[in-house]
């Protein structure tokens, strides 16, 4: 029974992480389109870089990365929570201070690559936690992750962007990402004795960002108004 629950939890994680990652990329694509124009170019390059970076991340997932899969995945989720959850705010600040368009574009595309690489690491780590010996593990985790990504694109197009806008959506998806990170601790994955203290510290960091983003979600409209006022004033 425990094995079954554990398996279902891994699949839920895969779905949610696939959902979060694609929404991060769509947020960045839309932000680039809004700031620099040429929507087709921005989204094409964003998705292309995202897929390439995912492949790089998957290739990096070997050796010591997989040896301590639970701790490594938690580190990945912390990074994704921070990079993805604050990506739009970062771009808004960079645009507000008036940096050149070329530098702005480089910074935005670095975010795209970083999120893609981290996303590419997630699947091998989830498969490692699920266990290679389980028949059909790899294809099920992949399938559920892709389903999550599909649902993310639909949610972004029909719910998040038209109803809430970029900033509230970024905070919410970052919060969802942080929630998955915190939930990793509740599953009691096998952690090496020497790494337990470090693992507990990582959970604390993830919990901190969860609280921060929960507050930001509640105040997202106010934050949005502040940025609009600043943009109009400048």
What does each model-identified segment do?
Residues 1-234:
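Alpha-helical transmembrane segments of multi-pass membrane proteins
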């Amino acid at each position: 029974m425990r094995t079954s629950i554990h398996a279902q939890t891994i699949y839920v994680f895969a779905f949610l992480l696939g959902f979060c990652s694609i929404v991060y990329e769509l947020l960045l694509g839309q932000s680039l389109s809004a700031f620099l124009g040429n929507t087709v170019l921005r989204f094409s390059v964003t998705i292309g870089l995202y897929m390439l970076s995912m492949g790089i991340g998957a290739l990096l997932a070997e050796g010591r990365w997989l040896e301590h899969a639970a701790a490594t995945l938690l580190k990945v989720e912390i990074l994704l929570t921070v990079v993805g959850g604050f990506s739009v705010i970062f771009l808004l600040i960079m645009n507000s201070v008036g940096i050149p368009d070329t530098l702005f574009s480089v910074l935005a595309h670095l975010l795209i690559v970083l999120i893609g690489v981290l996303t590419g690491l997630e699947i091998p780590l989830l498969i490692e936690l699920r266990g290679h010996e389980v028949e059909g593990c790899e294809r099920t985790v992949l399938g559920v992750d892709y389903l999550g990504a599909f649902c993310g694109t639909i949610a972004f197009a029909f719910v998040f962007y038209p109803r809430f806008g970029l900033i509230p959506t970024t905070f919410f998806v970052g919060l969802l990402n942080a929630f998955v990170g915190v939930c990793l601790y509740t599953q009691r994955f096998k952690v090496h004795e020497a790494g337990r203290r470090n693992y507990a510290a990582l959970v604390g960091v993830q919990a901190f960002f969860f609280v921060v983003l929960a507050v930001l979600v509640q105040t997202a409209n106010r934050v949005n108004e502040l940025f609009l006022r600043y943009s109009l004033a400048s």
